[in-house]
Amino acid sequence: VRQQLEEIPMTVRPDPTFHATAKLAMQAPPETLAFTLMLSPDGSQPDGLAVIDVDPKSSKYGQIVHQVIMPNKGDEFHHFGWNACSSALSPLTGHAFLERRYLIIPGIRSSRIYVVDVKEPLKAKIHKIIEPEEVFAKTGYSRPHTIHCGPEGIYVSTLGGGGADGTDGPPGIFIMDCETFDIIGRYEIDRGPQNKQYDFWWNLPRDYMVSSEWGLPPQFENGLVPEDLLSNKYGHRLHFWNLRERKNVQTIDLGANHQMALEVRPAHDPVKEYGFCGVVVDTTNLEGSIWTWWREDGKFHAKKTATIPPEGAKKDDLPPMLQGFEAVPPLVTDIDLSLDDRHLYVACWGTGEMRQYDVSDPMNPKLSGSVHVGGIVRKTKHPSGKDFGYGPQMVEISRDGKRVYWTNSLYSTWDDQFYPGDRGAAMVKADVGENGGLTLDEKFFVDFPKGYRSHQIRLEGGDCSTDSFCYPNV
């Protein structure tokens, strides 16, 4: 046996797409494929995963080159993530030899979870399906949302608690085994005042996590509830956790008028103790806003560091929900931070604008680039001449920071409220200038199959909202 063991070539190495630092990840080869979720807004056909050619040298650039269509209807695909990423290189992990091979795709409406094997992207296939009953039984949660690959497992946030309408107990986070994909159990030991959930991320070496709030299922599943918005009943708090103790150590209220504190984006270099959060709308003036949060002397703080004003509009140009305001709110629905922690991208889904901020000074974001496409009133066409329905929504950045991709659907029922009628799915790309600035690529416009909308994007080999880095940049 010993002789047999000695003859086995020792070639086990960490996945080459795992990087110790964000700086090293930026030097990796550029992506040639993207993975984008397709959802059927009325549930008339199954949702799917599109594999898209993003190699400018390819004859199929900007085209869907493979699809994985699910066996069920009514899932509503939304966010998704990898089984493993650079967090596997943490000195605390026992999983250094995992590979970035599987995409974990939850159905936000069905609470079903799919595991898709993309080792051969053009032959991607379903590996495992976790039925909603297992999610409910093992966690007491429903409506799984955000996926993050942690050092000891896959973390999944949820938007619903138990019961048919998801309001029996607060939502939270649960952990899945990153090899078997079994659900292990709830994350929280002490949740403190947290009773809503949306996004979450962390600083692994500093051992803390931050989470945000959207609303409970009755507040979003059938559309935005205007009465709840105007009475400030959506989420407006950030929660800070001791990651290992699984304990809420501090909650910051951004103010009840700052409705829907959504995406949280910590700095990628773990030496830096700050990050950003986007707030959809201020109910006193319809502004969108960016908040910077940071830790100092053991305490967390948050401050509004950028605002985006609404745009005036004629009543007849607006959907019924906005006619009384005679204005279009920017509706900040997604943000993303480049790996060098320099550029923050802000999707203004209402006004049809993608903004780029220079956040080299995180307390003083400076607008450094902007492009318009779509929008409730503007309806700006893409440079290709095609209509871009809805507005810029889920945004993803290449590892080297030179390319920015985005899609246009927010959430099926909200799409229909703010943009009545079906506007079609789209995915576009902008190139980033050497000193900032954005230019839409007129050759890149992905058409999706009829009847589908498009939501989150993941890039081959990792991107800027996936990987957690455990070592400082050098």
Q: Predicted regions: what is each one?
A:
Residues 23, 28-29, 36-43, 90-101, ...:
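Short, conserved, GDST-rich strand-edge loop motifs in beta-rich repeat architectures
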Residues 11-14, 25-98, 104-131, 166-168, 190-362, ...:
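Beta-propeller domains
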Residues 51-60, 115-125, 178-181, 240-246, ...:
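Short loop/turn segments immediately following beta-strands, especially the blade-tip
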Residues 63-83, 128-140, 186-195, 248-259, ...:
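Surface-exposed loop and turn segments in beta-propeller and other repeat-based domains
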Residues 11-30, 76-99, 140-151, 201-207, ...:
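Structural signature of eukaryotic scaffold interfaces centered on beta-propeller domains
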Residues 117-204:
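Asp-box/WD-like beta-propeller blade repeats and closely related beta-sheet repeat scaffolds
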